[in-house]
């Protein structure tokens, strides 16, 4: 080998060593940025976990409250049915009493009229009979007033049932919203798992290649550029493992290059 060839080989070797050091500096810079991203992603993940746990707790509490409301609603519905049945029974009894009272009143008036016609009772006796009739009518009016009070009470209970049904609808809507948010979180988790599996496969491919292959460095840079904007902990962790592996392989190579240059 001539001196000129040897000199060109030395220059080429130095150029390769300088290029390797430059790539190493870039990789270390990317490592620092990735570590920052990992730290931020970890903090964000912890915050999201805390929020999710809080939402799950709220969801459990509201589910428990919803079950209580369902139990209360069923009890009120049974009570309302019983009240409606009792109201119908009382109305029927009231109608029967009114009908019976009307018949008795008509029969009583007829008997009084016949008695007066037969025995010519004085007007004072007529007044006493009329007073008795008024007392009976007043008693019937009191009974009717009591029935109207019971009907108003049943209407009030029906209003409470409507308010509970409205509250139930609001809780069901909130439950549906929480279920949608939980589905979104599960989809994100599934996507992160798929990306992690892909990176594991890529890591196996890298280990099968020669550890000093510059193509590994270029591929790693492309992977870092591709995922450096991602905000997922699994991606950053996989890239960190690859970078550490390449760094541990390339660092011992520099002293060998320096020894070659000195020889």
Swiss-Prot record:
Return the InterPro entries for the record. CCDC172
Q: Which GO terms describe its cellular component?
A: cytoplasm; sperm midpiece
Q: Would the keyword Coiled coil be found if you checked this record's keyword annotation?
A: yes
Record carries keyword Nucleotide-binding:
no
**Coiled-coil stretches noted in the UniProt entry, renumbered to this chain:** 13-191
Cite the PANTHER family for this sequence: COILED-COIL DOMAIN-CONTAINING PROTEIN 172
**Protein name (database record):** Coiled-coil domain-containing protein 172
What is the primary gene name for this protein?
Ccdc172
């Amino acid at each position: 080998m001539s001196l000129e060839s040897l000199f060109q080989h030395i220059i080429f070797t130095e150029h390769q060593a300088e290029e390797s050091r430059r790539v190493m500096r870039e990789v270390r810079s990317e490592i620092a940025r990735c570590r920052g991203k990992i730290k931020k992603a970890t903090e964000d993940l912890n915050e999201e976990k805390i929020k999710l746990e809080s939402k799950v707790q709220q969801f459990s509490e509201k589910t428990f409250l919803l079950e209580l409301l369902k139990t209360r609603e069923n009890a009120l519905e049974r009570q309302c049915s019983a009240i409606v049945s009792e109201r119908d029974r009382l109305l029927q009894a009231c109608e029967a009493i009114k009908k019976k009272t009307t018949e008795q009143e008509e029969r009583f008036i007829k008997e009084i009229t016949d008695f007066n016609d037969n025995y010519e009772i004085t007007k004072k006796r007529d007044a006493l009979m009329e007073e008795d009739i008024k007392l009976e009518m007043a008693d019937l009016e009191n009974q009717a007033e009591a029935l109207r009070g019971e009907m108003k009470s049943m209407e009030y209970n029906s209003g409470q049932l409507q308010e509970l049904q409205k509250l139930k609808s609001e809780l069901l809507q909130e439950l549906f919203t929480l279920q949608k948010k939980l589905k979104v979180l599960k989809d994100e988790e599934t996507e992160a798992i798929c990306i992690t599996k892909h990176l594991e496969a890529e890591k196996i491919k890298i280990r099968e290649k020669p550890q000093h292959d510059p193509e590994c460095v270029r591929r790693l840079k492309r992977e870092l550029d591709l995922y450096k904007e991602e905000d997922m902990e699994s991606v950053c962790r996989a890239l960190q493992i690859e970078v550490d592996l390449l760094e541990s392989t390339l660092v011992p190579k520099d002293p060998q290059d320096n020894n070659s240059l000195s020889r």
